[in-house]
Design a protein with these regions (language model features):
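Extreme N-terminal starter segment of soluble prokaryotic enzymes
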Residues: 1-4
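Cys-nucleophile CN-hydrolase/nitrilase-fold catalytic domain and related Cys-dependent amidase chemistry
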Residues: 14, 23-104, 114, 186-213
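Structural motif
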Residues: 34-35, 146-148, 178-179
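CN hydrolase (nitrilase-like) catalytic-core segments centered on the catalytic cysteine
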Residues: 55-75, 157-255
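Active-site catalytic loop in hydrolytic enzyme cores
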Residues: 84-175, 193-199, 260-261
Length: 261
């Protein structure tokens, strides 16, 4: 299954983010990809108090666009869900097939300060979430489906977080996961950049090696608050397999890549 990744700017302007994601969809279509992965909060922007009406309209536009273009999407966005307990804000990866049909949703488990206002995934009650990514009606070269587990930012970096289960280990133990889809949006431009770079790189390499499950990961090119930034992303975007990077894109500005799983 050919999956593309988009290293793109994530601003607080939902309409601008929509345009950016559509351009990435176009790139993925031009490169005969089955699906596309976007960074954490790539549609909504990384602000829990997003404009709800604007976001609802933007998501509808994206869903219509992927159906028109016949490509799947793993969309990082904040979202307000209607659940049994009421309306709840979540940090999500929304998985779609190439007809614009939603296949499932991963909610972020290990929240950070930037997620203020969002509710964490109830791991104890609902367990790890596995999604079957697939293409409908359109035959493209290669595998047409794959079982994926979404890991949102700290859900991967927080592997082995004190007192908390490792989500990658839970996915491995399930025996159902073929791929980790990692959407992230990390801090950058601070005194900890060097050590954070090593931390992120080590996790992406070691988890892919220890679990023998590939990882596709994409990061935001802006600051977490959506402000422009001309330095490197907080982590590398690309694919790791068995402890090695098998794709390579610069960590500056908008970049796209794909890999055949």
């Amino acid at each position: 299954m050919r999956i593309a990744g988009a290293q793109i700017p994530v601003t607080l302007d939902i309409k601008e983010n929509t345009k950016t994601i559509k351009k990435s969809i176009d790139w993925a279509v031009e490169n005969n990809c089955h699906s596309l992965v976007t960074p954490e909060a790539s549609l909504s922007g990384y602000d829990s108090y997003f404009d709800e009406d604007t976001l609802v309209n933007a998501l509808a536009e994206i869903e219509e666009y992927i159906a028109e273009k016949q490509i799947g999407l793993c969309l990082g966005t904040l979202w307000k869900e209607k659940e049994e307990i009421g309306e709840v804000r979540r940090n999500q990866i929304r998985f779609y097939d190439n007809l614009g049909k939603i296949l499932g949703v991963t909610n972020k488990t290990y929240l950070v300060n930037q997620d203020n206002g969002c509710l964490a995934h109830e791991l104890d009650d609902k367990g790890i979430q596995v999604h079957n990514l697939r293409c409908q009606k359109v035959q493209k070269v290669g595998k047409q489906q794959i079982n994926a587990v979404g890991l949102i930012c700290n859900d991967l970096w927080g592997n082995g977080w004190p007192g908390k289960p490792s989500l990658s280990n839970l996915a491995l133990q399930s025996g159902l996961c073929d791929l980790f889809v990692h959407s992230t949006n990390g801090a950058r431009g601070n005194p900890h950049d060097e050590i954070y770079n090593k931390w992120h790189d080590a996790h992406l390499l070691m988890i892919s090696q220890a679990t023998q499950i590939p990882i596709i990961t994409v990061d935001n090119t802006c600051h977490m608050n959506g402000h422009p930034y001309d330095g490197p992303t907080s982590s590398e975007s690309g694919v790791t397999v068995d402890g090695k990077w098998v794709t390579k894109v610069p960590r500056l500005g908008t970049q796209h890549f794909y890999y055949d799983f």
